[in-house]
């Protein structure tokens, strides 16, 4: 006769096993699927001929034209990019890559956002976890991401936040697991027409859309006073990645991806993280190249114009980047000295930026903390405010140190687009007015190099008031 307690334990074990199977099913088939991540994972699991693997986030997926690079360097390449993937995802996807492939080179592609936190967003987890082959690897990846933020329940029950909305979406997800490429061809007419999966992990975006408005409205220089460096957890994961690659017998290259110029000029820590990563790699036998410091003769700065959002380029830009990478990598493989293609440090890089990327306006608050990112002196702004008796708006811009900017303010009619001058061109970038005189109205500022030609596209619209949101562009 079985002991009652033992029967209870068996029932509990059966319940937990059943729950685990239900959760695993829901997290696999009942969540929305990133079509391009699914295709990437399906192809990498089917391949065994990969000689060079690029591992990273959507930056890899959208910018490394693997087939083009393969033809140019004479080695079979694959772009293993998972959107929103951080180092935990890079480690898990590389383990998946190594199940059937033994690449000669594993190139870990990192951007500052990869190392500004040790946490991987659930968005990256839901793109990757369902497509890992082994339940053990799924659990190992799940634990690696959950231990950093403590979201064990949220991460275990992904389907609560990313559930399919219809039976059709459910069947689409099932199809992407069982017959991914046939399903892709079937549903392709319903997908974003701008995006095409080209194979070997590369997804190409073809659109006339550009990030001009996003750059204008969002990339505003900040000052935090914070010292940016790699987190201890980040250092541990980088060493874990190095050891994983070494155990496979592959050669590692850490590649710091070059984002658009405005990011380098404006975002706190953007270049600091890259410099910290370069130092860490040098101290730990990890070859590293910082493409953020690539000179125009290697990587043309005109690629800024090919971004369709703040981080991703259209296919033309990806082709230019891929060609630049090929030029570098072929020389690197040949043992050539490539140092002349790169600026020695950030100051040399900054000095090479001889233009203005974007400008903006912000309100001065006498009682608030001084904005250390402003080029104006605190005394000049305070004097213009007459001890808070007048409203003051300060204009600034992202530019290289060789550029001396000047600004001109206008009052803009949002309905017609008509502009009335408020100032002449001035280097101070300060607009002062009677208290409340411009509240709720639209101020437009233009920026240019002092004495230079006007650039009608280099402007910023600003509505003083409670919300202080950018004006509607007409």
Model-identified regions with their sequence ranges:
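C-terminal regions of proteins
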Residues: 266-360
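Secreted/periplasmic serine-hydrolase-like ester/acetyl group-modifying domain
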Residues: 125-248, 340-361, 370-374
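Surface-exposed, short loops/turns at beta-strand junctions within beta-sandwich domains
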Residues: 432-441
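Hydrophobic membrane-insertion alpha-helices, especially the h-region
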Residues: 7-28
């Amino acid at each position: 006769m079985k002991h009652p307690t033992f029967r209870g334990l068996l029932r509990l074990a059966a319940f937990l096993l059943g729950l685990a199977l239900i959760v695993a099913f829901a997290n696999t088939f009942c969540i929305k699927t990133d079509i391009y991540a699914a295709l990437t994972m399906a192809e990498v699991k089917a391949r065994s001929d990969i000689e060079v693997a690029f591992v990273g986030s959507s930056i890899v997926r959208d910018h490394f034209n693997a087939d083009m690079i393969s033809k140019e360097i004479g080695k079979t390449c694959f772009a293993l990019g998972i959107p929103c993937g951080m180092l935990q995802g890079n480690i898990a996807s590389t383990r998946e890559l190594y199940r059937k492939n033994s690449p000669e080179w594993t190139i870990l592609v990192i951007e500052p956002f990869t190392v500004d936190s040790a946490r991987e967003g659930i968005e990256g987890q839901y793109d990757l976890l369902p497509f890992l082959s082994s339940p053990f690897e799924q659990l190992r990846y799940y634990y690696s991401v959950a231990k950093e933020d403590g979201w064990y329940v949220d991460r275990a029950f992904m389907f609560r936040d990313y559930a399919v909305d219809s039976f059709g979406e459910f069947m689409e997800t099932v199809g992407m697991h069982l017959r991914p490429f046939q399903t892709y061809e079937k549903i392709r007419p319903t997908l974003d027409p701008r995006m095409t999966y080209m194979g070997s992990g590369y997804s190409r975006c073809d659109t006339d859309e550009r990030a001009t408005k996003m750059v204008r409205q969002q990339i505003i220089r900040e000052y935090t006073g914070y010292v940016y460096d790699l987190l201890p957890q980040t250092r541990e994961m980088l060493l874990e990645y190095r050891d994983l690659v070494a155990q496979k017998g592959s050669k590692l290259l850490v590649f710091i991806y070059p984002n658009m110029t405005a990011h380098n000029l404006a975002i706190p820590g953007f270049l600091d993280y890259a410099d910290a990563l370069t130092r860490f790699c040098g101290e730990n036998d990890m070859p590293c190249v910082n493409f953020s410091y690539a000179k125009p003769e290697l990587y043309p700065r005109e690629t800024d114009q090919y971004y369709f959002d703040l981080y991703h380029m259209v296919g033309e830009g990806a082709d230019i980047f891929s060609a630049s990478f090929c030029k570098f990598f072929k020389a690197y493989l040949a043992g050539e000295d490539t140092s002349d293609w790169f600026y020695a440090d950030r100051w040399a890089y900054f000095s090479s930026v001889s233009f203005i990327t974007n400008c903006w306006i912000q309100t001065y608050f006498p009682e608030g903390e001084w904005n250390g990112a402003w080029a104006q002196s605190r005394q000049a702004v305070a004097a213009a405010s007459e001890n808070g008796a007048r409203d003051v708006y300060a204009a600034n811009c992202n530019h290289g140190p060789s550029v001396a900017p000047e600004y001109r303010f206008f009052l803009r009619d949002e309905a017609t687009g008509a502009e009335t001058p408020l100032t002449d061109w001035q280097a101070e970038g300060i607009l002062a007015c009677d208290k409340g005189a411009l509240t709720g109205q639209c101020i437009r500022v233009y920026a240019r190099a002092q004495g230079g030609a006007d650039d009608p596209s280099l402007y910023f619209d600003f509505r003083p008031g409670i919300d202080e949101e950018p004006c509607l562009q007409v």
